[in-house]
């Protein structure tokens, strides 16, 4: 039988996990979105928008925000949950491993979605996603390291 103190301790632990998850995900999603915005106003973005049929910059930015938050929540959850099982000692490196793993999954699913143009989409999409995923992973790892640093 659980005591009330054990129940409160689990509740506190769950609340602490949720707070950390939210902070990491918001930071990572914001880094993803800022990187996407900077790329969207660059000259190379015109070819990318044409290839993926993005007609409106605001719509593309909203989609990037939603996608970045989903990826950031996923990476943050797995980093918090499985930090000790991931290779390496540095949390930034561990977050980058998770981020690039997510990118590989996304790229495979994108290629399966349109097999006729899979190679073109794979090259363009991977090239455009590397800076976004790099920013997301580095930021999540950095914030995680800051949260858990012993002073």
Predicted regions, residues:
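Juxtamembrane/disordered regions of integral membrane proteins
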Residues: 2-151
């Amino acid at each position: 039988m659980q005591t009330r103190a054990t129940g409160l301790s689990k509740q506190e632990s769950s609340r602490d996990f949720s707070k950390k998850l939210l902070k990491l995900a918001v930071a990572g999603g914001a880094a993803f979105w800022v990187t996407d915005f900077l790329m969207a106003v660059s000259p190379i973005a015109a070819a990318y928008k044409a290839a993926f049929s993005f007609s409106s910059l605001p719509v593309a930015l909203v989609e990037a925000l939603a996608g970045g938050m989903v990826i950031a929540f996923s990476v943050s959850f797995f980093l918090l949950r499985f930090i000790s099982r991931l290779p390496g000692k540095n949390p930034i490196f561990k977050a980058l491993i998770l981020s690039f793993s997510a990118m590989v999954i996304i790229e495979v699913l994108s290629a399966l979605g349109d097999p006729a143009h899979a190679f073109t989409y794979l090259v363009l999409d991977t090239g455009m996603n590397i800076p976004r995923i790099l920013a997301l992973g580095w930021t999540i790892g950095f914030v995680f390291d800051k949260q858990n640093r012993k002073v």
